[in-house]
Amino acid sequence: MTLHPDLQKALFVEDAEQLTPEQLAAAMNGPAGEGLSGTLGSRIGIRFVWVSKEKVVAQMPVEGNRQPTGRLHGGASLALAEELASVGSFMNVDPARQAAVGVDLSATHVRGASAGLVTGEATLAYRGRSIMVWTVEIKDEQGRLTSLARCTCNVISIGA
């Protein structure tokens, strides 16, 4: 298993600890600002805003991610939630030896969004040696909660 090149560049940048959460987010978005290129997240338009060990924030357009009724598809909300939790988990591991993978994801969709951007904010709820749990709030442009999710990531060994 190898890390995604954009993620690897962001995590292995010299003096990464000195970067602000906004600078880390920009690094995660890649040189073209398109998110982690070639991933589901980039295909559905996820753009990082804030990346730290305790919190990850990103935005995603409703346009292109709708269900047949014209509202944001619940699967797109879940993809946003897992993307945020996974990136946050990567911030808490040794990227030369470990990776984080989502193993459990659940959400309650409380309101539909039909236009604009939604913003997801993942907050680290528990960090252990082999597991991390994140709570994710997804809100519409008016700041109203649309989905509340919880994502659990396992920490696995990579490399030799």
Annotate each predicted stretch with a short phrase:
Residues 1-160:
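Terminal targeting signals and extreme-terminal segments of soluble enzymes
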